[in-house]
């Protein structure tokens, strides 16, 4: 599994994802996963905190990777993503996302995530992925 996750993560670091830094991902058990990333300067908004689009991107990618694994390594696409921003992420802070696969059907995966910074929750997210 570690090899499969690494290869898939290497693939997700192409294109747009090259711009946000090194997102790591690991499987905890069958329904729990974790992702992490350091907030880089190019991921800040004009107020000097992590841009909401950056937070949404890491949530979508972390939960999407979990959907891919939950779906038996089939491709999945996001059909719904809900983000709630709770506190600010700061420059060089490490963010850790805790992912839970809530339910999987033949064609859909339902997932939630909490994103933590240093001793605080930064955002929560939930979404639905279509299995292709």
Regions found by a protein language model. Give the residues of each.
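Terminal targeting signals and extreme-terminal segments of soluble enzymes
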Residues: 1-132
